[in-house]
Structure formats: structure tokens, C-alpha cells
Amino acid sequence: MGKAEGIEFLAKSEPWVKYKLEDKTVLFARLLITKVYRTDQYDPNGQPVYAWSSQNFFTTVAPKENKGTPSDPPPSSLNPSDYSVTPVDFERVGSEQWNIYELKDKTVLRIKLEVTGVVRTDKFAVDGDPFYIVSSGALTRMKVPSELLKKQVPKASPQKDIYK
């Protein structure tokens, strides 16, 4: 990654995204950026390259018929092979929502958590809700102020006399 420095940022929006699972449980998902770094590198478009640390959060609200006796010990592994699992279909409820962060250098980072898979385990959380394992990814978009762009110098190529 080269050299990188932490950069201050302001969280403008960090929404919970709601999903309805096929078993009638409601899943809430949220991504939080905890630190942003600006590197000394630039992408092919001349934009500074940023990196960040983030944490995903998931919580559920299950109907009574899905609840069970809390597992002892409480489930902690996120490895599906540690449990008997059932894939659960799901769909997002409401409109697409992006997290929005304004960096001190006026760059705007937009990032969206996207749930890509859900499995229900044979275990129950401390509140009696089924224990789910959620797979997810993040989509990002950056809007960099023009004054931060690095001018690209065209690479010289050997001149060929194509008009002979």
C-alpha cells in the first residue's frame, strides 16, 4: 500500500439496512467505518488511493415461533461448518441506502453493505433468536475534489513513421 496516513472524517449517514428473511425473521445490517487512511499512491485516473478499517454489525428480530432456548455455551463461531445450517432466502426492505463519509480533504466516501447470503444454524443466541451467519460485501464510490487529482503525464511511446 505504500505510505499511508490517517485522515479525519465525519459520518454523514450510517443507516441500518433492513432485510426480511424467508422464515419471517427481520435482519438488520450496518457497516461502520472506524478509520480512513490516505495513501501516497494514485489510481490510473489520478485520484488519491484511500484505505479504511470497518466493522459490520448484524442483529435480528425473530417472531415467537422462531425463538428457542438460548444455546449453552452461546454460539460464537462464524464458520458454517461448525453447525448444522439451512440456507435462508432474503430480500431487502426499503430503498437502497449508502453510508456517506466526508473526509477532511473534502473527498466523499460512499460505501454500501450488501448482504449476499444468510444461513440459519441449529443454535440460538442469548435472546432466543435463531443464530444466523451472514455473508456480505461492500460497494464503494469516491468523489474526489478536482484539486486533489494528480495530473497524468502521457507516457512517451516511440514514434513510428506510419506515413512512409
Which residues fall in each region the model found?
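A structural feature that tracks compact, well-ordered secondary-structure segments
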Residues: 31-32, 111-116
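Short, isolated positions in well-ordered beta-strands
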Residues: 26-27, 108-109
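Linear-motif-rich, low-complexity cytosolic tails and juxtamembrane regions
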Residues: 1-7, 37-104, 108, 116-164
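Short, charged/polar N-terminal "headpieces" of proteins
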Residues: 1-22
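Beta-strand-rich binding-surface signature
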Residues: 16, 26, 98
